[in-house]
């Protein structure tokens, strides 16, 4: 099942100043994975603050995490309280944070937020975020990006694909509104779409060098 958790007051969709809310929510409903889609990153209500949540065991990035981390995880920084890392071979740029201390997670996230590029007209870096809580540890995945939609979205005829990837898509489950897209999609095209919307590997490497200075 999936749910939407909206702010009762009309406020913009932004993660700035709201990460602790996300961590608190993940702890309160720890049977679920909580996710955040930026305003131009697949958000269902791009102008109103909300998180979404779904059952754990639904997206591969979460339920296959131990295998994924073993095969392509790379620690960027580690001490007794926190682990910062990234995935080396996921088609989409992925940073992750693991810690049992909310303040350390917030510190690491705030630094990453300052390192990520902000595009013209945006108020925060484009990103999707997923969060789980397995007592006593939170795990946060941050998926930074550089564009809202892939070129395939704007094609015509058989080349068009109606996809605006959000957190769920980039974590390995790609819901499609049209049967024709489902029938034509190839693995290679999905990888291409993920890479189009993601930060480049060069940008990711640069950010990692700075992020480890926490």
Stretches with model-predicted labels:
Residues 8-20, 25-45, 54-214:
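Conserved His + Asp/Glu catalytic blocks
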């Amino acid at each position: 099942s999936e749910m939407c958790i909206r702010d009762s007051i009309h406020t913009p969709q932004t993660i700035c100043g709201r990460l602790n809310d996300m961590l608190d929510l993940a702890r309160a409903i720890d049977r679920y994975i909580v996710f955040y889609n930026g305003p131009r990153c697949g958000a269902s209500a791009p102008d109103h603050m909300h998180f979404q949540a779904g059952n754990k065991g639904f997206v591969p990035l979460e339920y296959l995490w131990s295998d994924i981390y073993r095969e392509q995880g790379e620690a960027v920084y580690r001490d007794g309280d926190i682990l910062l890392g990234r995935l080396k071979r996921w088609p989409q740029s992925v940073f992750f944070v693991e810690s049992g201390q909310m303040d350390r997670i917030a510190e690491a996230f705030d630094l990453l937020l300052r390192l990520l590029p902000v595009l013209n007209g945006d108020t925060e870096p484009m990103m999707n975020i997923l969060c789980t809580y397995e007592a006593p540890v939170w795990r946060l995945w941050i998926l930074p990006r550089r564009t809202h939609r892939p070129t395939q979205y704007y094609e015509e005829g058989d080349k068009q694909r109606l996809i605006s990837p959000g957190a769920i898509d980039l974590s390995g489950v790609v819901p499609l509104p049209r049967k024709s897209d489902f029938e034509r999609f190839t693995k290679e095209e999905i990888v291409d779409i993920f890479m189009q919307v993601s930060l480049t590997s060069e940008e990711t490497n640069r950010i990692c060098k700075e992020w480890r200075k926490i």
